[in-house]
């Protein structure tokens, strides 16, 4: 597989509007990125926006190909045509935002091989779930920087890049994004997710203001398309009150299992469940503070008893009626994650054609964007390439 950490992105003349961000914002972001990387002989005028299509979100970067949430995975996602890259954010003990999918890091780093950290292994309750392992909030940034990333799904995906890349901070990701956008000659959006916000606030490490401060400190992310996402409700409401509506930063309400509750609601012993939030009345409430929803794929098109795609739900239609965009998660290129009619071969086998076919079935429902572990396949699905 080609590794593109320092290489220019493919299809450099193409960029998407994503969350319907104005052309002027894209142009400003592009010009800012080109100012940082002046060797790119391209201007906003020479690269006009294509007609709006569904935006491709690189889920944890190109995480099907490289260890997730590494700069290498983000570079690959950009090279493969992602319109946005997604860093999930957790906190260090010394108050730095770093990119990991969860604060327990034994599944995505080599922390278990470090004898100096053996006594950091512990058990905690995170959003109502007992979890054993090593947690970012028990490490300083300097300590985390001694660890290497590794593949989360070694039974499915290559481990060839294990031990090559370090954990990245949000500051590093933003700086890297500016450089990559300049090399690619196109605007690239950022879709950070606040992970376990109520938990971190409860231990004295609140995330929301630090995230906004970091984004507003960089000229690129002051104007580039940014979408902050969360499975919680309270932090999105807070961010809306802080940011208002006149901002380049949009808010995405993620939706978990309908039987479950948002982490902040659970902590407050509230009664709201995700099932309540996907009703027309619930969607109207979300529209009061967010710009879109991020449901699971099967909330949009459920599977039937045979594991095939069934009849689409009314969620996309209902969300659009409430003025919300719909950005489902997550398309993955291995058979085991696909609806039955798109599978070909053994469950653990990579199946690009099947993944593209499944994406197109969902695109037909009118979704506005989607998360994928393999942005190159997402690009094929959106652009109509075989």
Regions flagged by a language model, labelled:
Residues 27-37:
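Bacterial N-terminal signal peptides
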Residues 2-5, 41-386:
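Phosphate-group recognition and catalysis centered on beta-loop-alpha active-site segments
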Residues 14, 20, 33-34, 65-68:
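Residue-level recognition of conserved structural "scaffold" positions that shape functional pockets
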Residues 4-28:
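Bacterial N-terminal signal peptides that target proteins for export
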């Amino acid at each position: 597989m080609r590794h593109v950490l320092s290489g220019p992105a493919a299809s450099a003349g193409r960029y998407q509007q994503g969350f319907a961000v104005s052309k002027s914002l894209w142009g400003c972001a592009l010009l800012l990125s080109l100012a940082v990387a002046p060797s790119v002989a391209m201007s906003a005028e020479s690269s006009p926006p294509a007609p709006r299509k569904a935006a491709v979100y690189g889920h944890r970067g190109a995480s099907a190909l490289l260890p997730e949430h590494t700069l290498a995975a983000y570079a690959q996602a950009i090279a493969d045509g992602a319109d946005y890259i997604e860093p999930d954010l957790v906190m260090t003990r010394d108050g730095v935002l770093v990119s990991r999918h969860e604060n327990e890091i034994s599944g995505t780093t080599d922390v278990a091989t470090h004898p100096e950290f053996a006594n950091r292994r512990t058990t905690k309750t995170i959003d109502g779930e007992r979890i054993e392992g090593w947690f970012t909030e028990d490490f300083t940034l300097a300590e985390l920087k001694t660890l290497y990333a590794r593949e989360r799904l070694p039974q499915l995906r290559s481990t060839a890049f294990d031990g090559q890349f370090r954990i990245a901070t949000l500051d590093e990701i933003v700086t890297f994004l500016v450089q990559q956008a300049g090399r690619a000659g196109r605007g690239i959006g950022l879709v950070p997710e606040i992970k376990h916000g109520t938990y971190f606030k409860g231990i004295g490490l609140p995330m929301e203001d630090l995230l906004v401060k970091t984004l507003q400190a960089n000229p690129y992310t002051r104007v580039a398309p940014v979408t902050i996402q969360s499975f919680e409700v309270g932090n999105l409401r807070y961010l809306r009150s802080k940011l208002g509506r006149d901002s380049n930063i949009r808010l995405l309400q993620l939706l978990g299992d309908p039987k479950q509750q948002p982490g902040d609601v659970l902590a407050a012993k509230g009664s709201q469940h995700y099932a309540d939030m996907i009703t027309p009345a619930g969607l109207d409430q979300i529209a009061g503070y967010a710009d879109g929803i991020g449901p699971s794929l099967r909330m949009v098109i459920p599977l039937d008893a045979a594991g095939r795609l069934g009849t689409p739900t009314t969620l996309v239609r209902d969300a659009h009626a409430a003025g919300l965009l719909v950005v489902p998660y997550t398309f993955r290129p291995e058979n085991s994650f696909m609806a039955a009619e798109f599978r070909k071969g053994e469950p653990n086998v990579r199946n690009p054609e099947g993944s593209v076919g499944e994406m197109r079935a969902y695109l037909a429902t009118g979704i506005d964007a989607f998360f994928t572990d393999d942005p190159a396949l997402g690009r094929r699905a959106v652009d109509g390439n075989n």
